[in-house]
Amino acid sequence: VKICVLGKPLSVNHAYVTTKQGRRFLSKEGVRYKQQIRADVLLAAGFSAESMREAARIADPQSRLRVSYTFHLPDLLNSGWPKKAKSRYKRLDLSNLLKILEDGLFEALGVDDSNVFEILLKKEESEAAWTDIEVTVLENDGRAEEAERNGAPRTVP
């Protein structure tokens, strides 16, 4: 499944709010971003509920997933480089961008994110902000099928 999420990704620092008691909640901004992700997943699936369910079937509970994220960001370069800025590129932690995006993606697909066995993260400079996501099922090494043929319940190797 290939999905394009438009706009600059929301950092985990802005996605959640913490109360005085220390409880964390999804912020209004986080709720909007998750809704946008769901809309983008629906767009990629072709708008119908059936095609949405079909997209979710890419991974049964036994499947191992590979997810590739490419963040296209317009503001990677420091404008003051080399005189005022200490580094050529702005400090941008990819893992901070990943959490809310991943939560929204797998919630929209109806897939358990514990099935993700491989993640590829990239950031690239561009004129506009968007994120390309590709979710694929990893090829099985054959052990599960062999065990299944021998009468054992199917498990992830």
Segment roles from a protein language model:
Residues 1-157:
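Acidic, proline/glycine-enriched N-terminal capping motif
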